[in-house]
C-alpha cells in the first residue's frame, strides 16, 4: 500500500470514529509487516474477508476480488480514551504485469471494511449495538498472496502463531464482517473438506459380527452422523471380503488395548466426486497408522493428533512419517457402518508399502487401523435411546448425553467432540473381546474397565457404555480389491454398484453415433453376462437428434427436387 492509500484508510477511519465517539481519539496505522497472532498489551485480533476492487501499483489494471483479507490489531486504553489500530491487507497480484506487483484497494473499496471495523469497536470496546452478522466466505485459489505465504484464513488450519487473541486466547474464525471465535488449536477446516474437492470417494461398508447375517448390506451413499440410520441400502447384498475389528472407548486419550469386536467387511463402493462434500457431518480424525499381526514393537511414529503409535511388521520404515489424510467412520444403531475416504488414500498406502523397508512386508497379514472420535450426535435417534438404552438388551449404538470432552488430547489433537455414544452389547456377541479403557486407575460405572482387563458382558448388560472415540481395523486385502476394480469404476446416482467406468460411457456414445449400439451391447453381454443386465441403454437424446437430422436431410432433398424439376431428368 502506497502513502496515499495509507492516508486514505487512516483519515476515513479517524473521521468515522470521531463522528460516533468524539471524546475519544482513535488512530489507524497501516503496517506491511503485521504478523497474525503477535499481540502485546492485551490487543485484540480481528479479521475481515470480503469483496473489493483492486488496482495494480505498476499498471492501470483493475479487477474485482472476493478474496481480499484485511487484518486488524486493536488496542484500547479506556483510562486515557485512546485507541490504536494496526492493519494489513492481503490482495492479489496483477496478471497483466510480467513482474509481481503490489496492489491496493481502489476507492471507495475501503468503506465496507472500515464500517465493519467501526461496528466491531463500538460493540466490543463500548458495548454499543449488535455485532455484524457472520457470513463465511468460500476460499478462492489463484494469485492469493496469503495462500502463498501460508497464512490464508480460509484454506488451511491456523499456525500456532495465529492462536493468540485478546485476553481470551481464542482465534477469530473466518467471518464476513464478524468475530466468531473457535477454541485454541482447533482447525478452521470443517469435517469432510478434502472429501468434497473432487476425485473418487470410496466407502467400505461393515457390520458387527453377530448383529446381521453373513452378508453385509451395501450402503448407497456417504456415512451418516452418529445415531442416525445408514443411507438406504440396496436390494442386493455384497459378500464379505474380509474381517476386521472395531474398538470403542470412553476416554479421550485412550488407545486400544485389545482387538475389540469383530466386524465383517463388505465389498468397497465407488462414488463420484462431490457426493460427500456437502453431507458429511460424521466422525473425523487426521492421521492414520499401519498395523500388522505379531508382537508389539516400540513406537516408531506418531499419528497426527493421536499420540504414540506402534507400527508393526515393518510396514513403515523407522522414522518415516505418514501423511495427513481425511476419512470418515459412520456408525448406526443397528451395528452397521461404513469407512469413507478419498481414492488418493489407496495410492498413498501402495506407495508406502512399495518402498524398501527394514523388515518383511506381509501385505496378506497386514491390517490398517483408522482412529476416530465422535463429533456429532445432535441428530441421534431418541426412540432408540429410550428403548434399547434403558433396557440394555437391544443392539447397536445408542446416543446418550452431551458431555464435552477435553478440547485437546495427549497428542495435541483439537478435539471436536460434541457428545458421546452408549453401546449396549449385543446378546449374540458374548465371549468376544470387550471394550477397554486403558487409562490407568480409572473406572467408570458404565462397565468400562482399566487397561489389560476384559469387561464381562454380563456386567455391561445393566446399562449402556458411554463411548467417545475408537478405531477400526481393516485388512490390507481390501485395498487389493480396490486396485482390481480400478479408480475409473465410479457409480453415479442409483447405479451405485461400482461397475461402470468412465470409458464405458464414452464407448457407448460412440457406438450410438455410428448406429452400432446394439451390436456392441451383444458383444459385451457375451463377454460379461453378469453385468449386462445393469448396463444402461444408449442415451435417448442422441438417437432423437440422429433421426431429426435424417428427416431434415430427406425433406431438403425433396424440396430441391420439387423446386428444380429438371435436375432429375438431366441426371438420368
UniProtKB/Swiss-Prot annotation:
Q: Name one GO cellular component term.
A: membrane
Specify the protein's topology with respect to the membrane: Single-pass membrane protein
The UniProt keyword set, sorted, is:
Membrane, Metal-binding, Transmembrane, Transmembrane helix, Zinc, Zinc-finger
Location(s), subcellular:
Membrane
Transmembrane region(s): 544-560
Q: Which GO terms describe its biological process?
A: detection of chemical stimulus involved in sensory perception of bitter taste; protein insertion into membrane; protein targeting to membrane
Q: Which domain of life is it from?
A: Eukaryota
One Pfam family assigned to this protein is: Zn_ribbon_3CxxC
- Residues in 3CxxC-type zinc fingers run 52-148
Entry-linked SMART domains = zf-3CxxC
The protein's name is: Receptor-transporting protein 5
Single annotated GO MF? olfactory receptor binding
Q: Which organism is it from?
A: Homo sapiens (Human)
Amino acid at each position: 500500500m502506497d502513502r496515499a492509500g495509507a492516508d486514505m484508510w487512516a483519515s476515513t477511519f479517524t473521521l468515522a470514529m470521531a463522528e460516533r465517539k468524539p471524546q475519544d481519539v482513535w488512530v489507524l496505522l497501516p503496517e506491511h509487516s503485521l504478523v497474525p497472532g503477535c499481540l502485546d498489551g492485551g490487543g485484540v485480533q480481528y479479521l475481515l474477508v470480503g469483496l473489493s476492487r483492486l488496482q495494480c501499483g505498476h499498471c492501470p489494471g483493475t479487477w474485482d476480488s472476493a478474496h481480499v483479507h484485511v487484518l486488524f490489531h486493536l488496542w484500547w486504553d479506556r483510562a486515557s480514551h485512546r485507541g490504536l489500530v494496526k492493519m494489513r491487507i492481503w490482495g492479489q497480484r496483477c496478471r497483466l504485469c510480467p513482474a509481481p506487483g503490489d496492489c491496493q484497494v481502489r476507492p471507495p473499496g475501503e468503506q465496507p471494511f472500515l464500517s465493519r471495523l467501526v461496528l466491531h469497536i463500538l460493540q466490543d470496546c463500548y458495548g454499543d449495538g449488535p455485532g455484524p452478522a457472520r457470513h463465511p466466505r468460500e476460499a478462492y485459489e489463484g494469485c492469493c498472496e496469503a495462500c502463498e505465504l501460508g497464512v490464508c484464513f480460509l484454506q488451511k488450519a491456523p499456525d500456532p502463531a495465529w492462536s493468540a487473541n485478546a485476553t481470551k486466547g481464542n482465534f477469530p474464525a473466518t467471518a464476513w464482517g464478524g468475530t466468531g471465535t473457535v477454541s485454541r488449536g482447533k482447525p478452521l477446516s470443517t469435517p469432510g473438506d478434502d472429501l468434497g474437492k473432487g476425485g473418487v470417494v470410496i466407502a467400505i461398508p461393515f457390520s458387527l459380527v453377530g448383529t446381521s447375517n453373513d452378508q453385509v448390506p451395501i450402503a448407497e451413499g456417504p456415512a451418516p452422523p452418529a445415531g442416525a440410520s445408514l443411507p438406504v441400502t440396496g436390494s442386493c447384498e455384497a459378500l464379505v471380503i474380509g474381517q476386521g475389528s472395531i474398538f470403542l472407548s470412553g476416554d479421550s486419550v485412550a488407545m486400544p488395548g485389545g482387538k475389540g469386536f469383530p466386524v465383517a467387511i463388505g465389498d468397497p463402493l465407488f462414488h463420484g466426486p462431490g457426493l460427500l462434500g456437502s453431507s458429511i457431518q460424521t466422525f473425523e480424525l487426521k492421521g492414520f497408522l499401519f498395523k500388522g499381526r505379531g508382537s508389539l514393537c516400540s513406537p516408531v511414529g506418531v499419528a497426527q493428533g493421536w499420540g504414540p503409535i506402534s507400527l508393526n511388521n515393518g510396514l513403515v520404515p523407522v522414522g518415516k512419517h505418514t501423511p495427513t489424510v481425511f476419512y470418515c467412520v459412520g456408525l448406526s444403531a443397528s451395528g452397521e457402518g461404513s469407512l469413507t475416504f478419498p481414492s488418493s488414500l489407496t495410492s498413498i498406502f501402495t506407495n508406502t508399502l512399495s518402498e524398501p523397508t527394514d523388515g518383511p512386508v506381509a501385505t496378506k497379514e497386514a491390517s490398517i487401523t483408522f482412529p476416530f472420535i465422535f463429533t456429532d450426535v445432535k441428530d441421534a435417534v431418541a426412540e432408540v435411546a429410550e428403548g434399547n438404552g434403558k433396557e440394555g438388551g437391544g443392539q447397536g449404538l445408542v446416543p446418550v448425553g452431551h458431555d464435552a470432552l477435553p478440547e485437546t488430547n495427549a497428542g495435541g489433537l483439537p478435539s471436536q467432540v460434541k457428545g458421546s455414544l452408549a453401546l449396549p452389547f449385543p446378546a449374540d456377541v458374548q465371549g468376544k473381546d470387550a471394550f477397554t479403557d486403558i487409562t490407568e486407575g480409572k473406572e467408570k460405572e458404565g462397565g468400562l474397565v482399566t487397561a489389560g482387563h476384559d469387561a464381562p458382558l454380563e456386567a455391561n448388560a445393566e446399562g449402556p457404555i458411554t463411548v467417545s472415540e475408537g478405531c477400526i481395523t481393516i485388512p490390507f486385502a481390501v485395498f487389493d480389491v480396490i486396485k482390481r476394480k480400478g479408480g475409473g469404476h465410479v457409480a453415479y446416482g442409483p447405479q451405485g454398484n461400482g461397475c461402470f467406468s468412465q470409458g464405458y460411457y464414452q464407448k457407448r456414445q460412440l457406438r450410438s453415433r455410428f448406429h452400432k449400439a446394439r451390436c456392441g451391447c451383444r458383444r459385451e453381454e457375451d463377454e460379461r453376462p453378469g453385468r449386462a443386465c445393469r448396463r444402461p441403454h444408449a442415451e435417448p437424446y442422441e438417437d432423437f437428434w440422429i433421426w431429426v437430422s435424417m428427416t431434415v436431410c430427406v425433406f431438403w432433398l425433396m424440396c430441391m427436387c420439387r423446386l428444380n424439376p429438371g435436375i432429375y431428368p438431366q441426371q438420368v
